[in-house]
């Protein structure tokens, strides 16, 4: 299932995510198999780009590399670009972080 939400590009690995704001804590949820997106919960409110900044900071801590929104959007459905060389790097981290694979 993880392979369905990530895609390798020249710049890194893209991950399709679905963001929930105003959460109790920042965390990686599960993979939504109907939307084919990784659930990411963020404490921050979606006001003036604060949630987007919180997403980037949180994912950067998890992946230990640069992360960017691709493109920046106000929608809860987003795609993030993880700066890394291999899909396997992202898959291994997601397997560790996802609540139920």
Swiss-Prot record:
GO terms for cellular component: cytoplasm. SMART domains: DUF167. SUPFAM superfamilies: YggU-like. It comes from the Archaea. InterPro entries: DUF167, YggU-like_sf. Pfam families: DUF167 (PF02594). PANTHER family: UPF0235 PROTEIN C15ORF40. NCBIfam families: DUF167 family protein (TIGR00251). Belongs to the UPF0235 family. This is UPF0235 protein Mevan_0378. It comes from Methanococcus vannielii (strain ATCC 35089 / DSM 1224 / JCM 13029 / OCM 148 / SB).
